[in-house]
Amino acid sequence: MGEAAEGSLRLVIADDHPLFRGALREAVLGRHADATIEEVGTFDELTALLERDRDFDLILLDLTMPGARGFSGLIYLRAQYTSLPVVVVSGNEESAVIRRCMDLGASGFIPKTMSVAAMREAVAGVLGGETFVPSDISLAARADAETDAIISRLATLTPQQVRVLMMLSEGRLNKQIAYELSVSEATVKAHVSAILQKLSVESRTQAVIAVSKVEAGLWSQSQA
């Protein structure tokens, strides 16, 4: 995606910390003074916003904001809005986490410890069609073959199937999922069957385990 024309840039900052949202806003406005910036503090607010209006140039996403667990928010956004770039912003700067975000389709990763000036350059690079990760991170070190295979299979899920899978991971029953998605239990069962087939597993439990392997060892500490 080419960089948006001056004055037409539209971004979403999705983070539950107002002070950090302010820092990101400053970083963006320092380069694009006329940018339109929407701010949300929960993942539910983000999805509601995008259901109303998906005409944005970039999403700046906090991995661990309320309503998102681990990589679930990123996985959902990449499935639902394939052409909308997502840059992850996080206090978890483990190299494995950064690489996994890129594996899952992020356009960049901005550590929360970066200066506003550095954030400004990172955002500008992504808007110019580049990817961004901290200079000391090598993307050459890949996940193991099994995890790579799971990530590839996750990419085949439809947006609704991703939502169902995330709810399964939270321990919800078909009845609860049906209520939340405003669909019938039969529809949920059909989604679950499709998920099992696409992930090459035989049970709901195995599907949840498959997702957990993507996150294994990466979230041992609670970090914003």
Predicted ranges, named:
Residues 196-224:
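Basic, Lys/Arg-enriched C-terminal extension of HTH/homeodomain DNA-binding domains
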Residues 62-63, 90:
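Active-site residues of response regulator receiver
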Residues 42, 69-72:
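Acidic catalytic/metal-coordinating carboxylates
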Residues 98-103, 108-159, 163, 213-217:
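Short, flexible helix-to-coil linker/hinge segments that flank and couple to helix-turn-helix
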Residues 66:
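The feature encodes the CheY-like receiver
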Residues 54-60:
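Active-site beta3 strand of CheY-like receiver
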Residues 71-83:
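Short amphipathic alpha-helix used as the core "switch/output" element in two-component signaling
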Residues 171-206:
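Recognition helix of helix-turn-helix DNA-binding domains
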